[in-house]
Every structure is written in C-alpha cells, then in structure tokens.
Amino acid sequence: MQNDFIIALAWPEGMVSACGSWYDVFFAKNKKYRVGHSALVLVESVTGNLRYFDFGRYHTPKDFGRVRDVKTDGDVTIKTIAKIEKNQITNLKEILLEIKKKESFHGEGTLYASILNDVSYSKAYKYAKKIQKNGLIPYGPFVYNGTNCSRFVASVMRSSSPTYIKNARLKFPICVSPSPKRNVGIANANFYRVTEKAFIEVKRNWFESYFKSIERS
C-alpha cells in the first residue's frame, strides 16, 4: 500500500547563472536565468521522517552538478517530524516554515509547495540515492545524460509511482522542460505560498492547475 508523501518545493524568483550552453544566447539575460530552484521532501508516513533532496551546482566543477541530502550535506537536515492523521500531514505549516527559514536550501523569495499523495517513499528514496551515487552529473535542462534541479525533482516524483495522469504530466510537461512551478502544480492542484510574514493555502480547480501559473493564482 502506497500511503507516503512527497512535498514538491519551488522558489521561482531565484536567478541562476547561465551554464555556458549553446542556448544561453537565446534565453539568458546578463548571463542569468530567472528559473528559480526546485527541490523535494520525502515523507515516510509510518515514522514521520523527512528527507530533503535537491540537485545543483554545489561545490562542483563547471558544467556539473550533484544531488544533495543529509548524508552528503548535513546542513539540509529537517528536524521537524511529520504528524500524519487520516492520510494528511497535519503540521505542514511547521515543516514549511522550517524550510523557508533555512539558508542552506538556497531558496530565494517566496516558497511554493504542494503535496503529492499516495506514493512510495522507498521507491523515491532508492531512485534519488541511485542518481546521487553517479557523483558529478552534467548540468543543464537540455544536456544529454544530464539534468537540472527541476528535471531531477520530476524524475524522483515519477519514480514514486504516482497516478497514471500525474506520471504522464511529469514526463510530458506543457513547457519544454520541467520547471519548479510546473512540478508544484502537477503534484497537486492546491498549493501553499510561504513568505516571511504569511502562510497561505491556495485552492484551485482542475482547469486552473493545468493552465494557470502558481505565481498568478
């Protein structure tokens, strides 16, 4: 029975340095992209344990990235334990506020988050660790055998055995490549907006979740 969760995270406002690829001349502005950052938290329903994963150019050679979790980077630990009742995370606000305040996650601006329900923690964890064991991985959204933060998050969510429709949307996003905002929108129509002063739940219908950006909802 799959009754675990994945919390999809997005900081869309962050600026990322261009990686020196052929497409930079078309999309980068002043050698920067406004693509933000994407990450995820695996939630094990039995124990309430939380495991953060992301992918990025953290102390790596140029054009390469790596997968982070608590085993490789102790400062990405999440101390809060998830409280789960009736297949719902009841202390989500506490979890997201801890994430929002933690500088080691490298998130800039407003944090957006949503919950992917009824998935397999063990499958997602094994897949993320498998990618991590590859060590240095070519960085970029269109690089052969490479990845970036959004592609990594989408692939881990797919590995957790979500519903057929969500798996298809993650594999074939409307945009050219997975994005932080799109990952949050696919995981769940409803999402959370977290700032320094506010924690807001935004509820959307099926149509809005497909065609309306979380920043405009």
Specify the residue positions occupied by each region the protein language model found.
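Activation targets extended, charge/polar-rich intrinsically disordered C-terminal tails
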Residues: 112-116, 125-217
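Glycine-rich catalytic cores of cysteine/serine-nucleophile enzymes that process amide/ester linkages
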Residues: 4-101
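Extracellular-facing segments of soluble proteins and assemblies that are Gly/Ser/Thr-biased and enriched
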Residues: 78-130, 134, 138
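An almost-null, non-specific background feature
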Residues: 16-18, 42-44, 59-64, 101, ...
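N-terminal, helix-rich and Lys/Arg-enriched segments in bacterial and organellar proteins
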Residues: 11, 20, 36, 116-120, ...
